[in-house]
Each structure stands twice: as C-alpha cells, then as structure tokens.
Swiss-Prot record:
It is found in: Cytoplasm. This is Protein SprT-like. The lineage of its organism: Bacteria, Bacillati, Bacillota, Bacilli, Bacillales. Its cofactor is Zn(2+). The active site is at residue 68. It comes from the Bacteria. GO terms for cellular component: cytoplasm.
Length: 152
C-alpha cells in the first residue's frame, strides 16, 4: 500500500463512517514505534504506522484510521477531541472505532542481563545495564569487579 492508496482509504472511511470529507494528508510514518497512528493538531494531517498494516492487515488499519478521524473531525468542529473527553468517547462508540490498538507482536526487545563478581569478597551483582568496571567498585568491600557473563 502506497501513499495514494492510504490517502484514498482515509477519505473513503471518513465519508462512510463520519459523512464528512477528509481534506488533509494521510501518510505512513516509519518512525512510529509504539502507536498505531497519530493526528497532528497543527497541520491536521494523520500519520499511520506501516508495521501495523504489515502485521494485522487492512482491517486493523481501518480501525486505527477511524480512531484518528475521531480526533480529526472533533478538533475541526471545535469539540472535545482528547481521549478523556466525552465527545470523543461517544464518537468512538458511534463509529465502532477501537479506543486502543493491538500490541505489536515483536515490540519487546530481549532483555540483556549483565553479571559481575567482586574479586575480593565474591559478591555477585546482576544488572540490566552495563556498568563501567573501571569506575565502580564493590559496595561491600570496595574491591574491583569483573564481568562474569552477559545473557540475553
């Protein structure tokens, strides 16, 4: 799906569910990571996450488009367009738009675990972040630390 197709799809969804035209731009933004889409208040454009289309297909994308169009049409009309506003929640129910999008399948990265051991007292430290062993010492005996293992 390219930029022209997504623009056409957003315009069709706007006319079908809201009976109002969408007069601005709809584009894919590859930098979006944790959200399905966003409505830009200043430009009135809608940005969508292409990975949601790849993972879940057009049906999920239409749901995200309906959600963003709720923000769009309420903001244009001067009504409450934020997630907590009553107007927004009512319009979501009316057009059967999702309040939240599905979680990304491969969203979570593998967590690395670093293990260090004191050379003096053999106390072991387990950390999620790597530490500078030249700068930091054991909190118990002030001995030097050595890395034991790094697991992911």
């Amino acid at each position: 799906m390219d930029e022209q197709e997504i623009q056409r799809l957003v315009e069709e969804v706007s006319l079908q569910y809201f009976e109002m035209p969408f007069l601005h731009k709809a584009v894919f933004n590859n930098r979006l990571r944790t959200t399905g889409g966003r409505y830009l208040l200043k430009s009135h454009n809608i940005e969508l996450n292409y990975r949601y289309y790849e993972l879940y297909g057009e049906e999920e994308l239409v749901g995200i488009i309906k959600h963003e169009l709720c923000h769009y049409h309420l903001h244009i009309a001067g009504r409450g367009y934020k997630h907590g506003d009553r107007d927004f929640r009512e319009l979501l129910k009316k057009v059967d738009a999702p309040r939240f999008c599905k979680r990304m399948i491969n969203e979570e990265k593998e967590k690395k675990i670093y293990k260090y051991e004191c050379m003096e007292c053999s106390l072991q430290y387990v950390r999620r972040r790597q530490i500078n062993i030249k700068r930091y010492v054991c909190g118990k005996c002030k001995g030097k630390l050595k890395p034991i293992s790094k697991t992911s």
